[in-house]
């Protein structure tokens, strides 16, 4: 064969392969509905060094969430021995009191999945009792007192997170698999359901919606100042942004894709990666904690891996990737103060579990 013929043949082959790859990638993206966008990196990346904050108490076993308002900080202990919530003075973190007593009496909690601190009022979620409880600060501000309990509608399947939308409404993920979110009034009654799980797994949509909903478990946060509700998946790498002021919805999928799972006895068993573990919507951005560890690696290490994520991913209020922070600790929960350029985080691996990062 003449050299020109060989060159022509190679050119045609490369052109065909390029066209095939283009069609394949384009087809992959077209499988998703409109409003689904993909990202593979961040325009900025920085390393952050954590400063350990020493506590004057050793109460915390698994500090899962932290929220701060004014001169008060609350840390939620997912596996608390006696109480699930602990109140501290901020920024010194002197221990003040505990709340959310563990037990099965009417005034005690079987579990605490999350809590919200807003306008000097605390709301807690007990999934096992299917209850939301409001607590107010005492006159001294050094303790929290139960004010009311809201029993959730039976149509709301095992709520694992919640956000406060306004004085009359909560938003809770829908674990039936039929929709994405439930809107619930202050009496615990279901108002309606909105959205759908943005998956291309047609088989799961047809035959295993509850398992699909389990795999798509997401953590929520809502900012009433800008009307942005963000949901991030515990498995895979999916960020959903709902603008509740103009009813727009944007979905961003990272390089690890949507949650991967297999169905076993009606339950969704994870097979991909651990994704996000916390999210906070500030006035200007969306901050998330990302793990990115595969379940194969977790099983292979047999508990030797640190628990948590060592990345903080920052997105715009439209879900565009802005910055990736690489941490020197593995963390679970965060609280971000953009005014002071400070991130307070929880580390479940250490006896001193509260960290401070400066990103200014």
Regions found by a protein language model. Give the residues of each.
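Beta-strand-rich domains and repeat architectures in extracellular enzymes and scaffolds
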Residues: 52-83, 285-297
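Asp-box/WD-like beta-propeller blade repeats and closely related beta-sheet repeat scaffolds
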Residues: 137-168, 172-173
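Beta-propeller blade signature
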Residues: 87, 183-185, 302-319, 358
């Amino acid at each position: 064969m003449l050299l020109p013929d060989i060159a022509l043949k190679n050119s045609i082959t490369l052109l065909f392969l390029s066209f095939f790859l283009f069609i394949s990638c384009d087809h992959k993206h077209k499988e998703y509905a409109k409003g689904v966008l993909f990202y593979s990196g961040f325009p900025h990346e920085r390393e952050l060094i954590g400063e350990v904050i020493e506590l004057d108490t050793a109460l915390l076993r698994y500090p899962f969430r932290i929220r701060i308002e004014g001169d008060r900080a609350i840390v939620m202990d997912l596996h608390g021995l006696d109480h699930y919530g602990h109140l501290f003075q901020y920024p010194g973190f002197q221990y003040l009191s505990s709340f959310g007593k563990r037990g099965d009496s009417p005034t005690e909690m079987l579990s605490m999945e999350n809590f919200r601190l807003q306008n000097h009022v605390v709301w807690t979620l007990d999934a096992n009792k299917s209850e939301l409880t409001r607590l107010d600060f005492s006159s001294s501000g050094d303790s929290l007192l139960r004010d009311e309990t809201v029993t959730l509608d039976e149509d709301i399947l095992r709520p694992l997170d919640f956000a406060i939308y306004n004085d009359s409404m909560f938003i809770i993920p829908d674990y039936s698999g039929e929709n994405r979110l439930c809107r619930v009034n202050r009496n615990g009654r279901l108002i309606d359901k909105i959205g759908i799980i943005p998956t291309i797994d047609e088989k799961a949509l047809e035959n295993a919606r509850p398992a699909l909903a389990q795999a798509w478990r997401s953590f929520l946060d809502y900012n009433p100042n800008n009307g942005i509700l963000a949901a991030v998946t515990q498995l895979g790498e999916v960020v959903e942004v709902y603008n509740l002021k103009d009813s727009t919805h944007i979905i961003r999928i990272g390089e690890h894709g949507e949650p991967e799972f297999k169905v076993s006895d009606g339950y969704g068993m994870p097979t991909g990666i651990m994704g996000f573990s916390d999210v906070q919507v500030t006035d200007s951005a969306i901050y998330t904690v990302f793990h990115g560890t595969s379940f194969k690696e977790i099983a292979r290490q047999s508990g030797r891996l640190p628990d948590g994520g060592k990345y903080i991913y920052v997105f715009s209020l439209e879900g565009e990737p802005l910055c990736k922070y690489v941490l020197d600790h593995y963390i679970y929960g965060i609280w971000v103060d953009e005014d002071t350029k400070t991130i307070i985080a929880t580390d479940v691996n250490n006896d001193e579990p509260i960290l401070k990062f400066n990103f200014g």
